[in-house]
């Protein structure tokens, strides 16, 4: 038994060591309420329900231990633990302590196994994506490796950081979440570079209006829309608002936008990076490549960007991937016509280039398709909302500023071939400029191509064009900052009015204005724009095979007044929850930003360069504000995803395994308890039998010894009386001869002595009886008190044995009296 106790002491100390609890026990009885409460809180990470923090008595300790046992039985194990009670634990019952220690040991082992399994699955998926991205980068030409090296390090570092920070609670079934981490992480990174991208917004928009689909996708990757709201809060006021991507099965704006996985704060580089590798690398990370099925054929896969729908047809094994840019529709009519898709297929099928393909290892076809649809739908919805919020305001400012700008000739878009996440290639044909549209040409960010011959010429040409556009870009950037300053001033004035008349009336008025404007826009249609860089809603066109004119894509802009951005966002996201303090904080931050920008804009006596630096600083602070809001939103998403993962793990993945373990554990506990109870009953019966046998033997011995003593005592008394009687007779005969009178006195005196002796003997006997009676009554009273206090059967038998022994003693003493008479 001692060895068993030592083993359980070792188990308890190991549990305390694994849980980092600075307690050590030396005996099994040292496992009191504090030990089990500490184990519960350390293993399960929760406070004990109904806990008495400062126990003042043994009953409080028993209550705390019972609360631990009840929580384990009801909340985690779903089995009955009635054989373990808090009172027995506090009293130091070894069996109860062992059972509870065994439960905690098994629970810790089970949780450790689950954590290791999920961590292993996460590390395997993360390692696969790392190897996939690394292999893709090794296949790129030597001409592009040097320009992309810095961005690769950033992308890999950010991807691994996001994967490692997820923890073991990430659900193993959501394998597609890792790919979304890479894409959304790059999106968050490019958001930090928007201050650099704001230098030439108008030229960039003119480039996007007539460039090829590949260059459009490239620009989309350079300036993606970002979510900045916590539940129903604000989103980014971007200086370039992209058009809506047309996808057949896109979600409506009323449905919730669910983040695939919690994001971490974006990586802010300390040195500027070239936009060319940013766009290229983002395209790698924002597309999931199609898998190769078991029959040797490449399945169809649609990868959606902001304003391009790429259709990959089903090809036999060994052939090339063919990717076709499809016609993009407006936010209300999303499905492109069938004839236009056929024309796009015919256009893009003429420029295919072979590229090695690698089959995917883990993600299935359906998972890849779902990931692509989720990302494209999110980007398209956010793009449309950003465009609606800011497009009209910036359009008015740009129209006023760019009225006298001269027209320049437009160059044809260069042919580019992009690899799609290391599994296929995306090829685009040259894009002809639209006749009748002349605009300024922004130097393209991506001058590289997979064909190595014209790379250097294109780079030289674009560098020269960029140097020529530097003064114009500076003017455009200053105008853009001024436009934002004026917009924030109007926002501030509107907020002051809103404080006087109430937010509800303004919200209703904005809804009516929005409905009227949308109705007029639907009736009149989208106005023609001779200079596409003046508006934020781009018109994506597709060159047909026969050289026909591309049709503009119609998008309904949204009017956003000064202080209606946050109410409009609350209207567009009615399904998101925003707490009162968060909403008030957003209003205060926006108003503070508006006031500061207003103060900076009103200082006309400053120099031009100083004013420009202040406006850029205000824009940077605005980006920091939006980053903070985004972090808050992502934090809430991480918490929600963490809770969802735990709930799914408990309800779906681990349910069968936990049920089996619970059945086995309950059966084991029942068998152990039954064996222990049987052994205890056998020991009890054996002990009672031994007590009865011992009592009988002791009674026999006492009876024999008492009889011997009584016989010896009676014999001694008889001998003594006989000797004394003989002496008296002799003395009487002697004295009778001498003195008759003395003899008579001696006889009378002897009679008196005999009477006195008999009287004293009777008194002594009566005194002994009274003492024995009082002693027996006292012992009987004590035995009765002990019987009422302790109902143990063994102790009851011992009391009966003592009472029977006392009765034997009393009976034997009465028996010894009869021979003396």
From Swiss-Prot:
Biased composition (Basic residues): 431-445, 456-470
Keyword list, A-Z: Coiled coil, Cytoplasm, Cytoskeleton, Phosphoprotein
First-listed, main subcellular location of the protein, grouped into a coarse class: cytoplasm
Compositionally biased spans, kind Polar residues: 345-355
Record field: compositional bias (Basic and acidic residues): 395-404
Alphabetized Pfam families for the sequence: DUF5745
Subcellular location: Cytoplasm, Cytoskeleton, Microtubule organizing center, Centrosome; Cytoplasm, Cytoskeleton, Spindle pole
Gene Ontology CC annotations of this record: centrosome; cytoplasm; spindle pole
Coiled coil: 585-632, 700-794
Residue numbers of Phosphoserine PTMs: 449, 451, 453
Region Disordered, residue ranges: 118-149, 323-369, 395-475
Compositionally biased region (Acidic residues): 405-415
PANTHER family: CENTROSOMAL PROTEIN OF 95 KDA
Protein's name in the database: Centrosomal protein of 95 kDa
Organism annotation: Homo sapiens
Taxonomic classification: Eukaryota, Metazoa, Chordata, Craniata, Vertebrata
């Amino acid at each position: 038994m001692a060895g068993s106790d030592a083993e359980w002491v070792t188990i308890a100390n190991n549990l305390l060591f694994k849980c980092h609890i600075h307690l050590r026990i030396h005996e099994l009885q040292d496992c009191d309420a504090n030990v089990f409460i500490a184990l519960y809180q350390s293993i399960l990470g929760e406070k004990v329900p109904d806990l008495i923090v400062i126990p003042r008595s043994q009953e409080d300790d028993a209550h705390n231990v019972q609360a631990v046992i009840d929580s384990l039985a009801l909340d985690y194990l779903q089995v009955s633990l009635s054989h373990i009670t808090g009172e027995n634990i506090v009293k130091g019952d070894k069996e109860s302590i062992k059972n509870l220690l065994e439960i905690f040991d098994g629970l810790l082992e089970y949780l450790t196994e689950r954590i290791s399994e999920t961590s292993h699955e996460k590390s395997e998926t993360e390692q696969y994506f790392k190897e996939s991205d690394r292999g893709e980068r090794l296949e790129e030409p030597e001409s592009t490796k040097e320009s992309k090296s810095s961005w690769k390090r950033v992308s890999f570092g950010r991807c691994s950081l996001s994967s490692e920070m997820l923890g073991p609670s990430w659900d193993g079934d959501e394998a597609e979440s890792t790919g979304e981490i890479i894409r959304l992480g790059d999106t968050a990174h490019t958001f930090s570079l928007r201050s650099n991208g704001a230098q030439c917004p108008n030229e960039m928009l003119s480039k996007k209006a007539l460039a090829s689909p590949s260059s459009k996708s490239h620009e989309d990757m350079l300036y993606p829309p970002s979510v900045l709201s916590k539940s129903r809060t604000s989103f980014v006021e971007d200086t370039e608002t992209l058009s809506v991507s047309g996808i057949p099965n896109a979600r409506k704006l009323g449905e919730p936008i669910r983040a695939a996985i919690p994001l971490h704060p974006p990586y802010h580089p300390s040195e500027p990076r070239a936009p060319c590798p940013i766009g290229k690398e983002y395209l790698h990370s924002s597309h999931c490549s199609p898998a190769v099925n078991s029959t040797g054929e490449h399945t169809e896969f649609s990868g959606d960007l902001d304003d391009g729908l790429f259709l990959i047809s089903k090809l036999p094994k060994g052939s090339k991937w063919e990717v076709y840019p499809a016609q993009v529709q407006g936010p209300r009519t999303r499905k492109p016509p069938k004839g236009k898709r056929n024309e796009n297929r015919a256009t893009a099928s003429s420029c295919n280039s072979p590229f090695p393909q690698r089959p995917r290892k883990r993600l299935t076809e359906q998972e890849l398709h779902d990931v692509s649809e989720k990302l494209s739908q999110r980007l398209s919805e956010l793009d449309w909302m950003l465009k609606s919020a800011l497009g009209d305001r910036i359009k008015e400012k740009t129209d006023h500023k760019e009225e006298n700008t001269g027209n320049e000739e437009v160059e044809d878009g260069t042919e580019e071939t992009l690899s799609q996440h290391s599994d296929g290639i995306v090829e685009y044909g040259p894009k002809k400029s639209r006749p009748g549209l002349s605009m300024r040409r922004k130097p393209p960010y991506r001058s590289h191509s997979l064909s190595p011959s014209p790379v250097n010429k294109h780079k030289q040409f674009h560098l020269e064009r960029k140097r020529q556009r530097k003064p114009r870009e500076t003017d455009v950037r200053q105008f853009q900052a001024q436009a934002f300053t004026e917009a924030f001033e109007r926002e501030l004035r509107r907020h002051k009015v809103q404080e006087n008349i109430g937010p509800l009336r303004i919200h209703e008025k904005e809804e009516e204005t929005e409905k009227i404007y949308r109705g007029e826009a639907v009736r009149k249609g989208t106005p023609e724009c001779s200079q596409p860089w003046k508006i934020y809603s781009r018109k994506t066109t597709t060159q047909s095979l026969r050289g026909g004119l591309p049709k503009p894509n119609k998008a309904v802009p949204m009017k956003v007044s000064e202080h209606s951005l946050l109410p409009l966002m609350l209207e567009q996201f009615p399904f998101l929850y925003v707490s009162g303090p968060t909403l008030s904080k957003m209003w205060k931050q926006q108003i503070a930003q508006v006031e500061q920008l207003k103060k900076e804009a009103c200082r006309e006596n400053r120099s031009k360069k100083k004013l420009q630096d202040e406006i850029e600083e205000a824009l940077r602070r605005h980006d920091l504000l939006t980053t903070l809001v985004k972090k808050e939103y992502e934090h809430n998403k991480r918490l929600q995803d963490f809770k969802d993962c735990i709930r799914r793990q408990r309800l779906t993945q681990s349910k069968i395994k936990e049920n089996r373990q619970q059945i086995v554990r309950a059966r084991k506990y029942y068998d152990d308890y039954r064996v222990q109870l049987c052994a205890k009953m056998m020991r009890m019966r054996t002990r009672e039998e031994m007590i009865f046998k011992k009592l009988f033997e002791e009674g026999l011995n006492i009876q024999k010894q008492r009889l011997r003593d009584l016989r010896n005592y009676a014999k001694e008394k008889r001998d003594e009386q006989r000797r004394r009687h003989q002496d008296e007779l002799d003395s009487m005969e002697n004295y009778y001869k001498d003195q008759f009178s003395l003899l008579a006195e001696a006889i009378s005196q002897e009679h008196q002595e005999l009477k006195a002796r008999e009287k004293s003997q009777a008194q002594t006997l009566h005194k002994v009886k009274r003492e024995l009676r009082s002693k027996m009554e006292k012992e009987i009273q004590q035995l009765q008190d002990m019987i009422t206090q302790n109902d143990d059967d063994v102790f009851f038998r011992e009391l009966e044995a003592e009472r029977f022994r006392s009765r034997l003693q009393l009976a034997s003493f009465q028996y010894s009296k009869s021979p003396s008479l």
